């Protein structure tokens, strides 16, 4: 949290009790918000700010503040020098009032944190106390912002954060009432539900059914007796492109944000998912009673991709913001990364293999050669305007590649197509990649089965995407196009040295990339031997029994 604030920022755990700024009350009126907080001792405050977490588009706005020593009637505005007696005692708690108007700020989507800067050079986060966090669950603290919504929430370490996003259908009062009614019903009937041993399975945002979660769910539906599978549920949005083919599972398929969805999230014995707990409910919701309960549930993390190319321990680690109970991996190589960097005991990091790999087979055809280009998303570009995205290096580099005349001519000459697959978090920017190159086809993730694209492709071009492991698993060549490697390392980092340990050729510029593409086409997309040898270390199983192992693991843990 508070990325980019440097070493001066004091975390909740690093601050002594006297240095923690604790929020005791929040007030919202129109576009104005007021924070009432308390410090354990006198602080020489230099300024108060509202600061964006976006590292590529940094911004901060000054906030007004005043100090009031407890037991005193005077208020102090701006910078205040405390008396020698007050400073010497160091024990006199001080009240702080911080306020601002979002109507005078240009805020964009994402997280905005409140900080106090002291004259000693500290940057102190503002922490929500337990009572205030509880009030956020039941009160309406929404700050109106047109078709957007801005609201206070507790982020990592209970930091006060204002979150800005597009307004969604689940922001309604009706949804809030339904959540509270379902919660009350569950609490009154809790013993009944606890006996059912409910498993809840889902994938990214509950909008997809084509990752490890759905393949494990299908295995359970097709291989377990009725008594065992009756309380195994898959959550999916009715708007999902996979909804029609999943309807055959009847009541085991649960509509997203329905009353049953809310109830099963509360009653579940365990979640089994390819993404974190917050993907199992409304995304970035206003504080509510159900998400508070979700965060405390057991979870088997099936993962979306092999953990190696992107550091995620601050998110998924034992002490991270989204910790897991069990963390499924694919090999001893990956297990070592997780146990050494995430803080989990080895017995909670089982080597099971990915359930979606049970159905993988090489379907590449010599008469339908295609190169799948699948870049991952950039956190610093998420929720940005179309103008900001189009001006980014990310957009510019891929547009130049798709429109490269030398590459286009070579593809045409060899009858090779490019399928450019954009990440779902950037699907609104698909138009930015439109090209007149007739060898290029643009698609958004979810519009076609991803595993089919992987099985049918001749080669993959990516940057840091974990889908590269699926292609590596199938013994196909992978090219890594890492033009923004330094920025990626700054923002994310990795667990392997990507300058030497990747399982495919690496390029930093378009000239290198086009050269390698042409070489692979000329060699009929044959994987290089040195990369083929790495497969033994990277995959413990290729026996198509990963779902069975996953089921056996859950049963062994009494789930």
Language-model features, listed with the residues they occupy:
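Basic, ligand-binding patches in group-transfer machinery
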Residues: 1-198
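Active-site and donor-binding regions of nucleotide-sugar-utilizing enzymes
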Residues: 35-38, 65, 198-360
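Conserved catalytic-core segment of nucleotide-activated headgroup transferases in glycan assembly
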Residues: 210-217, 355-432, 507, 539-542, ...
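Short acidic-hydrophobic, aromatic-tinged amphipathic segments that line or gate anion-handling sites
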Residues: 252-259, 441-446, 502-516
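Donor nucleotide-activated moiety binding/catalytic core segment of transferases
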Residues: 254-264, 424-469
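A donor-sugar binding/catalytic signature common to diverse glycosyltransferases
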Residues: 278, 283, 301, 447-492
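Catalytic binding pocket for nucleotide-activated donors in carbohydrate/polymer assembly enzymes
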Residues: 346, 432-437, 466-541
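C-terminal alpha-helical cap of glycosyltransferases
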Residues: 543-559
